[in-house]
Amino acid sequence: MNLEETMPLVFERSIPGRIGFSLPESDVPETNAGDYFDQAYIRSIPADLPELSELEIMRHYTNLSNHNFGVDSGFYPLGSCTMKYNPKINEKVARFPGFANIHPNQPESSVQGALELLYDLQTSLVEITGMDEVTLQPAAGAHGEWTGLMLIRAFHEKNGDTKRTKVIIPDSAHGTNPASAAVAGFDVVTVKSNEKGLVDVADLKKVVGEDTAALMLTNPNTLGLFEKDIVEMAEIVHEAGGKLYYDGANLNAIMAKVRPGDMGFDVVHLNLHKTFTGPHGGGGPGSGPIGVKKELIPFLPTPVLTKKEDIYTFDYNYPDSIGRVKPYYGNFGINVRAYTYIRTMGPDGLKLVTEYAVLNANYMMRKLQEAYDLPFDQVCKHEFVLSGNRQKKLGVRTVDIAKRLLDHNFHPPTVYFPLIVGEAIMIEPTETESKETLDSFIDTMLKIAKEAEENPEIVQEAPHSTYVKRLDETRAARKPILRYQKEV
C-alpha cells in the first residue's frame, strides 16, 4: 500500500466552497486592511487554504495519527535518545489549572506556587548532578550545550584568558557537541578513542594546552561505556586551565549512583525531556537546564530564580551574566513534568531507574552478540553498540536491518552512529521495558540475522508491511519540500 495513493494531502482534499466552521454574523463595520497596514504586507490574492468539512478534517488527521509510532505504541530502542515511557501522572499535574492557566507576564506574587516548583526542581537537580547552581532557562539539549559553553567563554574572557579558543571533543561524541562549540565561537579539536572505546588519555595530554577552553565529555560515552579515567582527565584539563563540560545525554546510566560534579565536571547540561520523562521525539518541547560550579555562577543567564526568606523571585543583578538565552524562564510545562517524575520516584526510585536501564542493556547485548559483531566486548551501561559488518559481507546493510524491524512493529535503533563503528547499531532499551518486550526484540534481531544468511532479499527489500516503503532520504534531507504549492 502506498500512502501517497491512499491519503492525499489536506490541500489536495480541498473542495472550493466547502465549509467546516460556523461563525456568528459580524456586529462591527467592515474595514479595509489597507487603512491599517502597509500594502507590502497585504495579500494580492487570497491564501490558498484547504476547504473541507469538519468531518473530513477529523478523519484526515485521525488517520494520519494512526500511522504514527511512539513509545506508547511500541518498543523504541533509539540509542542515545532514552525513549523511556512518559508516566501519565506527569500530564495530569501539568494540566493543573494553577500551572496550565498562568501567564509568564503575571506578577511574581501571583505565581508563587509555580516559582516554588521551579526552585525545588533546581534544588533537586543540584543534588543529582553535584553542581552548585542550576538554571532552567535553556530550551533543550543542544541549547544547553551552547549556553554552558558560552558561560565557559565568558569566564575565560573575564579572566583575560582570551587565547583559550579550542574545545576538545572525543571522536565518539554526539554531533551536537562540535556544532555547539562552533556556534559558541570555539575551534574544535578531536581526541581519539583507544582500543577499548574510551578516551585515549595519552592523546588527550597531547592536545590539551594553553589554548584549551574546555573538554566536552559524555559519561558514559556514546558507546555506552563508562570513562573510568575521568578523574585523571579532569586533572589534566584543570591543570592546563581549562574547564570540564558534561553532556548529560547519558545521565540515565548513572543517575543517583554517581554525580558529574564529583567526577570533576564544572558545567553540566541535562535533558529533562529524556532522563526525566518529558515527552520528546515529536511529543513536545524539550528542556535543557545547565548546572555549574561556584566560580561560574556569576555568568549564568538572567534572571536567576532565587528564594529570599519565604518569597521566590527573579534576580537580575548579575553584571557578568551572558544575558537571557530564552524568553521568560524555560519550557515550564516540561519542567513541571520532570519535577513530578523526580518527586514520584524519590532517591531510591531514581537508583532503580539506573540499575534497570543498565541491566536491560547488558542483557540484550549478551543475547545479541552471538549474531552480530560486538566491537567493544565489556560491561556496558544504559546502551550498547553492535556492528552489522558480519551481515554486510552477506549483502545486507545496517539500514536494511533497521527497515526490516519496521515489519515487526519495532522502531529501529540508532544506526551508523557513533561514526567510529562501522555499520553501527546503537541500542538503548531504557528501564521501563519488560523482559518480555526485550526478548521479543532479541528474537526478531536474531531472526533478521538468519534471514541475512538464508534469504537476504527479504531484508534488502524491507519494509514490506508499512504504508510507505523506502524513501529517498538523501533527497529529502538535501532538497526538502517545506510547503505545499498547487500545480498550475
Curated annotation (Swiss-Prot):
Swiss-Prot/TrEMBL keywords: Oxidoreductase, Pyridoxal phosphate
Cofactor(s) essential for the protein: pyridoxal 5'-phosphate
Keyword Isomerase: no
Keyword Oxidoreductase: yes
Record field: catalytic activity: N(6)-[(R)-lipoyl]-L-lysyl-[glycine-cleavage complex H protein] + glycine + H(+) = N(6)-[(R)-S(8)-aminomethyldihydrolipoyl]-L-lysyl-[glycine-cleavage complex H protein] + CO2
Entry coiled-coil feature ranges: none
Entry function: The glycine cleavage system catalyzes the degradation of glycine. The P protein binds the alpha-amino group of glycine through its pyridoxal phosphate cofactor; CO(2) is released and the remaining methylamine moiety is then transferred to the lipoamide cofactor of the H protein.
Subunit: The glycine cleavage system is composed of four proteins: P, T, L and H. In this organism, the P 'protein' is a heterodimer of two subunits.
Official protein name in the record: Probable glycine dehydrogenase (decarboxylating) subunit 2
Source organism per UniProt: Listeria monocytogenes serovar 1/2a (strain ATCC BAA-679 / EGD-e)
Taxonomic placement: Bacteria, Bacillati, Bacillota, Bacilli, Bacillales
Gene, per the UniProt record: gcvPB
